[in-house]
């Protein structure tokens, strides 16, 4: 999920099988999400991205740089090396808005169960929840 700084969802990825980690097809997934945001006439130049250590890959950091996305990604200590990347711990604390949005989504029991086997139904349930979240914020 990509949210704005208030936690309002802007884009959602397609469902990914549970046996994959966060970084599986990450660049392709985020690129598709960014294109969806741009189709809505929302500018993504200079987009600021907070992400946890699960998204700390060289390929994803390069993607962010190429697409003028300012990344603030916690370093994954399991990668075995400390890169020369800037990381702002104060700004990283703002990442809670995405976690809060995830908690809001968990309030929708149809999504929480996650046994939906039809991809279109899963996506539709998420988009419906996003609409409710947006309406609550207005």
Region locations from a protein language model:
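A residue-level signal for conserved active-site and pocket-lining positions in enzyme catalytic cores
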Residues: 7, 99, 128
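Loop/helix-junction capping segments adjacent to catalytic residues or to phosphate/diphosphate-binding pockets
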Residues: 20-23, 57-58, 122
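Catalytic-loop motifs flanking and including active-site residues across diverse enzymes
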Residues: 22-25, 97, 124-127
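Helix-centered, glycine/charged polyanion-binding patches within enzymatic domains
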Residues: 38, 43-118
